[in-house]
Structures are given as C-alpha cells and as structure tokens.
A protein has these predicted regions:
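Membrane-interface helix/loop caps of multi-pass membrane proteins
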Residues: 1-241
Length: 241
C-alpha cells in the first residue's frame, strides 16, 4: 500500500529499481493471512464450509470487478494516452482474487477422501484435464505479461487463478499420475526452494544489469543470473530456511 500511496510504478522506473520491490506480493499474501482466518472462523461458526466458500467466491468476483472498474475508469490501456496500471496491480483490494479462489477450493476439495481406483475413462479425463490446465498455465507464463490489457479489463487474473486451482485439484487427485510426475526431479527440487528463488532472483537481477553492472548480455547474462539465484537460494534453503 505504500507503493500505491506513493504512486510508484511497477512497470516503469529510472535507474536501479528498489531491491525489495518484489516483496509487494508477499505483503498482499500476509495481509490476506491476517484477515481471512478470522473471517473464515466467524463464517464457520454461523454457517459451515459452504458459507465460507460462497463468501470467498463473492469476494473474488468483487476483487475482479474492482480491478476492471479501476482499469476502465482510469483508462489504463487507452491507446492514445495509456495510464500506468500499477494501482490495480499492487492493491490488495484489486489483486486478491487468486488467494480467494484458493480459499474457496480449500472448502470442498479433499483429495484424501477420493478413490484412486476409478474407471479408465475417468482417469483419462482427470489426467487430461490436469495436463490441459498445466499447458494453459505455461501459456500464461510464456505469452501473457503483467501489463497485458485483458488481464485487467477482462478478468484475466481471475481466469488464471481458476486455471491454477483446476491444476492443483487434478494434480492432487489420487487417480491422476500428474501429481507424481510433478513430484519428480528437478520439479521437486525447484518447488522446495521456490520461496528462496523468488526472494533472491530480483536483487540479483537488479545488480547484474547488462552493460551497466556486468559486461554481459543475452544468454551468458541469463546463465549468470540463474546460477547466482539457484546458488544463493540453495544456501538460504540449507542454512536459513
């Protein structure tokens, strides 16, 4: 929220960006973790899991609608005079849909109660759906950016959250081999160290700017950055985390 109040841009900067700028997403998470357990507890006392689920869904839709409203009313993506969309991107109110979709999923998806022995057709459907969701997530990663207009104006962040929720559900279904595939190396190694990789990648990238900080560019620079990121994340995982 400090970034929002200071009108700091996530997308544009002059000089070296703040070393801890990427921690905004962890701030959104922690704010959610402070508030949502109490909300869920009160809802469970009055209703049940179903009540928690519908409130989470409603709030996810409201967060998405608010992001759309901010994007349209502020003309973030006006082709003649676009405005920086950082307010909608940084805001907990406008970027909480993913957390809320996860909260909704947790109220009804219980893979431990599902059967691993299912008909072949059902196994194919579960596995195929999971693989399709995984491909879709990779497609978002490769071809969609945080400054893509329809992510803001058409509910793209909610769509991505739903696809990820579907992937989680199918990967944890006992009848699907997808979870086993994702649990093999090197994916398990990366997953175990993903928090450290996220924490360290940004400052490392910011102190290795091409030509400005290091005499490298392109693939050699990427190799250096990834090597440093994985190396420091490994030390962090072993001796700190």
């Amino acid at each position: 929220w400090k970034y929002v109040i200071d009108q700091m841009s996530y997308f544009e900067f002059i000089g070296r960006p703040p070393m801890l700028k990427h921690l905004w997403s962890l701030s959104v998470e922690e704010q959610f973790y402070f508030v949502w357990p109490a909300v869920a507890f009160l809802l469970m006392r009055r209703w049940n899991r179903r009540g928690v689920r519908w409130v989470a869904i409603a709030l996810a839709l409201l967060s998405t609608a608010w992001m759309i409203r901010l994007s349209v009313s502020n003309a973030y993506f006006d082709p003649t005079n676009p405005i920086d969309p950082s307010r909608a991107y940084f805001g907990t109110d406008s970027h909480a849909m993913g957390l809320l979709v996860g909260a909704a999923l947790a109220t009804f998806w219980r893979p431990g109660r599902l059967q691993a022995a299912v008909p072949t057709g059902a196994r194919v459907i579960v596995t195929g759906t999971g693989v399709a969701a995984l491909v879709a997530v990779l497609g978002f990663f490769l071809f969609v950016g945080e400054d893509t207009a329809w992510m803001y104006t058409r509910g793209g962040f909610l769509v991505l959250a739903l696809v990820v929720a579907l992937l989680i559900a199918m990967a944890t279904h006992p009848a699907s081999p997808l979870g086993g595939w994702l649990g093999t190396q090197p994916w398990r190694y990366i997953g175990q160290r993903s928090y450290g990789l996220y924490l360290w990648h940004w400052p490392i990238f910011m102190v290795t700017r091409p030509t400005l900080d290091v005499p490298l560019d392109g693939l050699p620079l990427l190799v250096l950055r990834l090597g440093l990121t994985f190396g420091i994340a490994e030390l962090s995982y072993r001796f700190v985390e």
